[in-house]
Every structure is written in C-alpha cells, then in structure tokens.
C-alpha cells in the first residue's frame, strides 16, 4: 500500500498547473446529459490460475482511452486524449494502473474461496466523476448483476445482492487507505483530468451531425397486423428522441431499441410500432436532435411508397427500352436474311459471308441484351429487397 500512496503523491500533488482551465467555465455541452469521465474494467476469472482484465476510458459516450493488457500501458485513442496532464503525471497514472490490475487479480483469486466466488465468473467495475458535480461514483457488478458500490465514504451492498456482498463490504470498509486512494483518484484527479480533456477536445465534443431517417416494415407480429420500423442513423451527439406519432399525439406503443454505435463514431437507433394493417395510414415518425436546430425530422408512413412507385416505374421503363431494342435488332436481322433463289454466284457467296458475319454480330447483340436485362433485373430486385 505504501507504493500506492507514493504514486498518488506524485499524481495528486504535482505542484503547478493543478487548477481546472478557466476557459471551461463558459463551456456548454452539446448534449443535454451532464458530461462525465468513466473508467470501465472487465475482469474474467476462468479458474484459480487464469484471469484476464480489460480497461477503457470514456468521455461521455466517446471512448478516449484503452488499456494494453500485453504491454501494461495506456492507449490514447484521440490526439487530445492526454488532456492537460504532463508526461510525468501520465507516467504516474500508468504506473498506478499497472499495479492495480496486477494486484486486483491476485487479491480476487486469493479471496475467491473465502467469499464463495464460483469459477468461472466475471467482475465489472465502473468508476468516474462528473463535471461540476461533487459526487463520485464506483459501481461493481458480479456475473452481470449489481453487486456493491463505493458511496464516497463507505462501501455499500447493492439491493438484492445478498449476504456475500454484505460480507465483502464489511471487509473493504476496514481498509481506510483504500478509501483515501479512491477519494483522491475520483474526487480530485478525475475532475482535473476531465476538465483538461474537455478543453483539449472541445472542437470534437461540439461536433454535430444530422440524423438520417427512413421507414420499413418489420416481421409481421400477427395476422392482419404490421410492425412499422423507423430507422434513425448517422447522428451525433448520442442523445436523441424518436417517437411514432399520429398527428401531434405520441403513440405509447412505440418501442425503442438500444442506441448503437456506427463505425464513424455516429449513432443508430430504431423505433418500432405494432399496429393493425388498417391503422397504419396517418402515422409518422418524429425525430428530435440537437443538430436539427429545433426543427423536427418527420417522415410520414406511406410517404416512402411514392419512392417505391418511382422505382417501379423506372424498372418498367428500362424493361420496355430493352424489349424495343431487342425487337429492332431482330427486325433488322430478318430484313437482311432474304436469300436469292438463283444459282449461287460470287456476289451471293460474298453476301453469304456477310450474312454469317451479321448473324454472329446479331447473336452477340442478343446475348449482350439478355445479359443487360438479367443484370438490371437483379440489381433492382436487390434494391427492392433492401427497402422491404
């Protein structure tokens, strides 16, 4: 524990540059949610001799840091992920986490029998701080369920976690040095690091990307019923409001899925509504997002059918053109295939050769037209399937 305190002395008391940047006093978040910095740890224990831990750091919903389990080093995922910390401060922080991950696995494996932790099991820890808020947070989950938390001055078992969580909290509450370390790390170092990140990444945090939305039919929930699906994608920041509407009336049956990340660091969400087939008319999907400047995005159910009609008309026109071209080629070929009934002459022989050449050319054209038709049909069929 002495080593932890020495590391923290350098981390929490670096001398100069300990105040949060003044420029942040006027900083306003693009999202409605209060911004936080969160550290997430996932440790898997297969047996008493094998365990694996992963760690990551998140500024709001944006991952800014990772933990290299092989090298035991912090991975900075953004050019500004260093914040305003000095190299020495980051080195101290990295040394602290190296010691923590190594010690955590040893302590858990040594205590698994005492607290009846049955292999294999998984422990998740979420800890961090919020900007301009005094409270800190640390929550632990065991096998995917809430287990215990650190409330700033004491460890508390989660409701329904049972006697095992109560016993572990009793043991943890005896170690005052652990409480002091957490209070310093989460109550002092974390807010200062969060302030530096917000200043360094201000331009990216203020980025706004407008959502795109489209409608489709999902799997039928039953005879005579429809599942209407509203897809919203490509928006940033994450907070978004999506609802099926009838006029100005919200449809309470709207089911929202999870907000999922896209590869370009934007977000995707779908909202569904099960209705009787005859009640779909007049419904619309409304999207509210900070990038829209107060103007809601509204898509009416059935509006997309006009688009489908245009596609169908385009397909029909294309097929008609192909049929006309095919017909003309056949007509030209038949006009030039009239043979003379007289004895063959050199001119006829020459014409025969020409005819063979033209027949070959005609067959090639027919094959090409057939290939074009098949290809076009295949493409349009694929597009239509995607819409449905």
Swiss-Prot record:
Expressed on cortical thymocytes, dendritic cells, Langerhans cells, on certain T-cell leukemias, and in various other tissues. Residues 1-19 form the signal peptide. The chain crosses the membrane at residues 305-325. It holds the Pfam family MHC_I_3. GO terms for molecular function: endogenous lipid antigen binding; exogenous lipid antigen binding; lipopeptide binding. Glycans are attached at residues 47, 84. It comes from the Eukaryota. The keyword Amino-acid biosynthesis does not apply. Residues 20-31 form a propeptide. PROSITE patterns: IG_LIKE. GO terms for cellular component: early endosome; external side of plasma membrane; extracellular space; Golgi apparatus; Golgi membrane; late endosome; lysosomal lumen; nucleolus. Residues 191-301 form the Ig-like domain. Mono-ubiquitinated. Proteolytically cleaved in late endosomes to yield a soluble form. SUPFAM superfamilies: Immunoglobulin, MHC antigen-recognition domain. Keywords: Adaptive immunity, Disulfide bond, Endosome, Glycoprotein, Golgi apparatus, Immunity, Immunoglobulin domain, Lipid-binding, Lysosome, Membrane, Signal, Transmembrane, Transmembrane helix, Ubl conjugation. Disulfide bonds join 230-285. The keyword Nucleotide-binding does not apply. Heterodimer with B2M (beta-2-microglobulin). The association with B2M appears to be facilitated by the presence of the propeptide. PANTHER family: MHC CLASS I-RELATED, T-CELL SURFACE GLYCOPROTEIN CD1E, MEMBRANE-ASSOCIATED. T-cell surface glycoprotein CD1e, soluble binds diacetylated lipids, including phosphatidyl inositides and diacylated sulfoglycolipids, and is required for the presentation of glycolipid antigens on the cell surface. The membrane-associated form is not active. This is T-cell surface glycoprotein CD1e, membrane-associated. It comes from Homo sapiens. The lineage of its organism: Eukaryota, Metazoa, Chordata, Craniata, Vertebrata.
């Amino acid at each position: 524990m002495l080593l932890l305190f020495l590391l923290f002395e350098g981390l929490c008391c670096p001398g100069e540059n300990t105040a949060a940047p003044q420029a942040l006093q006027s900083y306003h978040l693009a999202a409605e949610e209060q911004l936080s910095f969160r550290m997430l740890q996932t440790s898997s224990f297969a047996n008493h001799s094998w365990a694996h831990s992963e760690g990551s750091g998140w500024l709001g919903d944006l991952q800014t840091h990772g933990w290299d389990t092989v090298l035991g080093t912090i991975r900075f995922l953004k050019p500004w992920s260093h914040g305003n910390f000095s190299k020495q401060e980051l080195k101290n922080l990295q040394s602290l986490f190296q010691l923590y991950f190594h010690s955590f696995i040893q302590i858990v494996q040594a205590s698994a029998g005492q607290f009846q932790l049955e292999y294999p099991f998984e422990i998740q820890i979420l800890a961090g701080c919020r900007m301009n808020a005094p409270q800190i947070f640390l929550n632990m989950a065991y096998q995917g369920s809430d287990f215990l938390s650190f409330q700033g001055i004491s460890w508390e078992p989660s409701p329904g976690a049972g006697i095992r969580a109560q016993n572990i909290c009793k043991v943890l509450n005896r170690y005052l040095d652990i409480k002091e370390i957490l209070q310093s790390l989460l109550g002092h170092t974390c807010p200062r690091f969060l302030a530096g990140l917000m200043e360094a990444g201000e331009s990216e945090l203020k980025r706004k990307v407008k959502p795109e939305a489209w409608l489709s039919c999902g799997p039928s929930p039953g005879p005579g019923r429809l599942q209407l699906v509203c897809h919203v994608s490509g928006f940033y920041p994450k907070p978004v409001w999506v609802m099926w509407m009838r006029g100005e009336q919200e449809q309470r049956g709207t089911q929202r899925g999870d907000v999922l990340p896209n590869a370009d660091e934007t977000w995707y969400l779908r909202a569904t509504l099960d209705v009787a087939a005859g009640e779909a008319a007049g419904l619309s999907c409304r999207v509210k997002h900070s990038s829209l400047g107060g103007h809601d995005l509204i898509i009416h159910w059935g509006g997309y059918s006009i688009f489908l009609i245009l596609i169908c008309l385009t397909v029909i026109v294309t097929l008609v053109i192909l049929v006309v071209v095919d017909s003309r080629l056949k007509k030209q070929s038949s006009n030039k295939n009239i043979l003379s009934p007289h004895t063959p002459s050199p001119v006829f022989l020459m014409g025969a050769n020409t005819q063979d050449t033209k027949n070959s050319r005609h067959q090639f054209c027919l094959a090409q037209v057939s290939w074009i038709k098949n290809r076009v049909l295949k493409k349009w069929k694929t597009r239509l399937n995607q819409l449905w």
